[in-house]
Design a protein with these regions (language model features):
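Ser/Thr-rich low-complexity repeats and stalk/linker segments
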Residues: 2-112, 154-157
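Residue-level detector of conserved, well-ordered beta-strand and adjacent loop positions
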Residues: 10-13, 122, 132, 146, ...
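Short, well-ordered turn and helix-capping elements at secondary-structure junctions
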Residues: 13-16, 149-150, 170
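Soluble periplasmic/extracytoplasmic beta-strand elements of cell-envelope proteins
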Residues: 38, 81-83, 120-122, 144, ...
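Residue-level signal for well-ordered, solvent-exposed loop/turn and beta-edge residues enriched
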Residues: 45, 162-163
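Primarily a LysM-type cell-wall glycan-binding module
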Residues: 110-137, 159-162, 169-170
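Short solvent-exposed coil/turn linkers within tandem alpha-helical repeat scaffolds
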Residues: 136, 151-153
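Short, structured beta-strand/loop micro-motifs enriched in basic residues and often containing a Trp
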Residues: 142-149
């Protein structure tokens, strides 16, 4: 019998915005149903670490869900890497590090994230103008809008029709 294991992340997805507390969900299997979860900064240092229990138990793939809490978050707009993996049942020097079926998801952290607005760029808009228009809904900056929208490669060039995420902070 050729039973294999797997881990898949359903949330968050690549380039999602996350706050200092966010939910990780997916499907997977690991030793005794344990799914390992780590959040790394750009240097690879661990910002948060936790685990979840797969509903599949020992060998079956099942759903999992848990909350990640970052006690010392990086500055707003920082790209971080979420690692999700099946727990390694071996000794520290055995098996893959950090675990089996490693999945990595690059997300953008805004520690005080309250949510975000979806804004459709109109003819004549600038990022500074968008900051002014959205001010009644919450605080944001041009730099944060650029960080929240990977498609913006030059802050002076946005296109009519683009949908932008406008991060709102507490």
């Amino acid at each position: 019998m050729a039973i294999i294991t797997d881990v898949r992340v359903r949330q968050p997805l690549k380039d999602d915005l996350v706050g200092r507390r966010f939910t990780v969900t997916g499907i997977g299997s690991g030793f005794e149903g344990t799914i390992g979860i780590r959040l790394l900064d750009r240097r690879g240092d661990v910002l948060a670490q936790t685990s979840a229990q797969s509903a599949g138990g020992m060998a079956a793939v099942g759903e999992f869900s848990t909350e990640v809490r970052v006690t010392s978050p990086p500055p707003a707009g920082t790209r971080v890497t979420l690692q999700v993996f099946g727990d390694n049942p071996g000794l520290p020097d055995e098996g893959p590090d950090p675990g089996f079926n490693l999945r990595e998801v690059s997300v953008i952290m805004f520690p005080d994230l309250q949510g975000w607005l979806l804004y459709r760029v109109e003819r004549g808009d600038t990022l500074t103008g968008i900051v002014r228009k959205t001010r009644p809904f919450g605080r944001t900056t041009v730099k944060q809008i650029v960080a929240a929208n990977p498609r913006i490669t030059d802050p002076d060039r946005i296109e009519t029709g683009w949908r932008l995420r406008i991060p709102l902070r507490d």
